[in-house]
Regions:
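Active-site rim helix/loop that mediates acceptor-substrate recognition in acyltransferases
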Residues: 44-68, 72-82
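Acyl-donor (CoA/ACP) binding surface of acyl/acetyltransferases
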Residues: 1-40, 54, 74-208
Length: 208
């Protein structure tokens, strides 16, 4: 595992990934105000008070394993192909929230060497390959910098868009499981799916 690295700023061809901080709270509120963004998570927009709670949870999780946490993604020119990553977030376009916390859910392993990959993009940036681009950077960070043994990702089985990102970055399907929900969303009867990337898979993909 990495030693005292902190959570670094990351950069891709089109995106600047800045570690989540309290100054980003209003952007989280804006993101979660769109019910379509949360269709497969909450099935509705979230209130400001709900975002207060999730922001606090994210900030706490970001400190549990050095180098892991949450990033706010910023871009330029609508995230179009060929658009450059901004030099800094000042004046840049907010694209979404990228996630790589330690695994922590009820249906996830209690193992600090396992991280969970996630992504939540503002709707105007969908279908441009930005979630895939950011996910590749987070996987590289997880294995090459932090030293994780495994990265998992979970979503509703019917969420074909999210599953497509997982498959496009080389993750493999592991299982379908059926959590018990108090207020199940449409499509939840098909269950949740889990994908993974192991260190061995990552090494093989890099040809080393």
């Amino acid at each position: 595992m990495g030693d005292g690295m902190g959570q670094p700023t990351l950069r891709t061809e089109r995106l600047l990934l800045v570690p989540l901080d309290d100054c980003h709270f209003e952007l989280e509120v804006e993101l979660d105000a769109d019910p379509e963004v949360l269709r497969y998570l909450w099935g509705r927009a979230r209130t400001r008070d709900e975002v207060v709670g999730s922001h606090a949870d994210r900030m706490a999780l970001a400190g549990k394993v050095d180098g892991l946490g949450y990033w706010m993604a910023f871009g330029t020119d609508g995230g179009r192909r060929g658009s450059p990553a901004p030099e800094d977030e000042t004046g840049a376009e907010f694209v979404g929230l990228m996630m790589l916390p330690p695994a922590h859910g009820e249906d996830q392993p209690d193992d600090p060497t396992v991280a969970e990959l996630g992504y939540r993009l503002a709707r105007r940036y969908w279908r441009q390959g930005l979630a895939t681009e950011a996910s590749r950077a987070l996987l590289r960070h997880a294995f090459d910098t932090v030293g994780q043994s495994r990265v998992i990702a979970q979503t509703m089985a019917v969420n074909t868009g999210s599953r497509g990102v997982m498959e496009s970055v080389g993750m493999r399907y592991v299982r379908t499981f059926h959590p018990l929900w108090d207020d199940p969303l449409p499509g939840s009867e098909a269950g949740e799916v889990e994908y993974e990337m192991t260190r061995a898979m990552w090494t093989a993909r890099r040809g080393t």
